[in-house]
Amino acid sequence: MWLSVALLTLLDGALAAPARQHSGAFDMPLTWTPFGFTTDAIQIGTPPQPLVCFVDWTWIGQYAFTPRCHGGSQGTYACLQHGQPLYNETESRTFANQSVLYPERTWNPNHFFFYNDLSVGFGSDIERVGPDHQARVTLQLADMHFQLDMVYPFGGVYGLSPVFKSDNASTQSPFYQMWQQGVYRSPLVSFVYCHNSTFDQPTPRRELCHGKDGLQTLGGPSPVLSLSDKNNSSPILWYDNIVFPPVNEIEFVYQPAVYNYWALRLTRHLIGDEEQALNTSIGGNPGAIFDHASYGRGVPMSENSYRRLIEITGGRPVVLDANVAPNNGNQSFVSVDCEKVSSFPNVKYVFEGHDRVWEVTPANYVERREVDGKEVCVLNVRTLGEGDWIIGNFGETFAKDKVVLFDFDKLRVGLADVPAAAY
């Protein structure tokens, strides 16, 4: 795209990552993996044990693989595969056992291991995030009751779920725990995705994500927003978070139930200018869950709106292996004419609280894939539920040209456009 002289002048001093404007924040670089985004910025214990963590907007604490297996630490590899990254509390002189304060907990089913137990004990230790942020936090210490069938490319889960008033430290995000101790001055976290271009459309520059795939800012708004000027502002629209119980029945099924999600109500869903029906039979407008892990891949649609998009785009059924499919949803996939993608309609959403229409362009919801040695363009759509819209996940596909923010104090979700100067 052509840049105006004024914009070129603005960019002249902005090609490096912008200077941090909010003291006390940390811009945590993220690496894309098939599971979701991970970070290598976390260490736990004394001396510090590096722990690559999966960053999860839908989990309620700092989870860590440990040597524990069936309640003991002697038979670790009867549960874990050799080479599995983990945190070993016996090697930390600052570890404190919290088993009396918080008894062991088990979820079954769960969305980690499904119908195998997700069992954790509790302890606290010093967690370091980046070079300058550290505090004692409560940890969820994995106690495996079965053998993992693979080595996971991370040793823990850094949860960023909202924290409710009734929650104690056993189900609190490690970010929230540190913010409560004054380590971060702001209760905000924010995300920007420096993704690869599929159809040569502009994408946020990699240096804005410190050369990585994404940036999860802890303790403030994304520094990308500081690139806006007075004539090209990118205001944040804030939406009040809701509790949406059907999420534990339709999507992330846990027993005991988990309801800590960044969630909004959807008031409109459109394909181009064509309104799509919403299912309002569950006590109001349907739900929108924010999740940038693998379950947030694909533009969220209902079964019926996906069927309509297939009609509009002339989609044809295509069979994709799991390692080729653009997302892990249960819906079927269709191929479309790569030459016609620019003519496809935007997929649109309106959330309760504002009339702003948020859009996903066809260049962001169509993916190129190789099938039998040939390039195929595939609709990257993920559906949940049956019939009209009842629930959907808003993650990396939705966020390709947006900044997503969460406010842990006021329990709000914020959305903003990525400023033009970031491209």
From Swiss-Prot:
Result of knocking out the encoding gene: Abolishes the production of most pyranterreones, but accumulates pyranterreones 7 and 8.
Residue positions with a glycan: N88, N97, N168, N196, N231, N279, N330
Alphabetized CDD domains for the sequence: pepsin_like
Active site (record annotation): D56, D291
Induction comment: Expression is positively regulated by the cluster-specific transcription factor pytR.
Keyword rRNA-binding: no
Family: Belongs to the peptidase A1 family.
Record protein name field: Aspartic protease-like protein pytH
Lineage summary: Eukaryota, Fungi, Dikarya, Ascomycota, Pezizomycotina
Gene, per the UniProt record: pytH
